[in-house]
Amino acid sequence: LKLAYRDKYLRENPNDFLEKIESRDIHKEFLTQDELKTLASTPCDIPVLRNASLFSCLTGLRISDILNLKWENLCTAPDLGHCIRLRTQKTQTEALLPISYEAYALCGEPGTGKVFKELRRCMTGYPLKAWIKKAGIQKHITFHCFRHTYATLQIAAGTDIFTVSKMLTHKNVATTQIYAELVSEKKRETVDKISLK
């Protein structure tokens, strides 16, 4: 509509008659670095759920991308080390994302087909809640919260918002800005700064 108005197809800009929608405060739950370490050291009844969850915390990948992640998507780039090359399910964005050795190790022994073969979406419900509870974490954590964890811990560790935005494959840095607002202090730098040990 804005273009139609600008190109003189419309006499008036319809947007001038709309009321601005106020943005709501959206609370995004995430794990702190200590909670992440606690979760990583807590036994999980479903090993593939543990590995995929921690992988998401270390990479920021969505559950849809983890469920579809294949060994052929993992590669090594000369300047980046271990990487994931994929087209994201949600935004269809092509990306080459560096990952830490720790994240790569969670994938297990290289093979063919899907990386997390036994992972099912239903595991991200009750089994995930049971593992979180077993770890003593008193927050409402869903699988998507691991993506929030990645973003928040990266920003807290000092990674610039543009880099975090690219790692999350956000099309707009403003989307990533939400995480910056969750963080009150900056600490260190890039990929290896989020650790399970």
Question: Residue spans of the language-model regions?
Answer:
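DNA/chromatin major-groove-contacting recognition/catalytic segments
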Residues: 38, 95-98, 105, 109, ...
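Basic, Lys/Arg- and aromatic-enriched nucleic-acid-binding interface segment
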Residues: 6, 10-63, 67
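C-terminal catalytic core of tyrosine-transesterase DNA break-rejoin enzymes
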Residues: 54, 58, 65, 147-171, ...
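Catalytic-site neighborhood detector that most strongly recognizes the C-terminal catalytic loop/helix
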Residues: 30, 88-92, 168-193
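Residue-level signal for the short linker/turn that defines the boundary of a DNA-recognition helix
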Residues: 50, 61, 141, 158-159
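Conserved tyrosine-mediated DNA breakage-rejoining catalytic core shared by Y-recombinases
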Residues: 17-35, 68-107
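Active-site/catalytic core of tyrosine-dependent DNA strand-transfer enzymes
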Residues: 98-138
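Short, polar N-cap/turn motifs at the start of nucleic acid-interacting alpha helices
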Residues: 73-80, 138-139, 159-178, 189
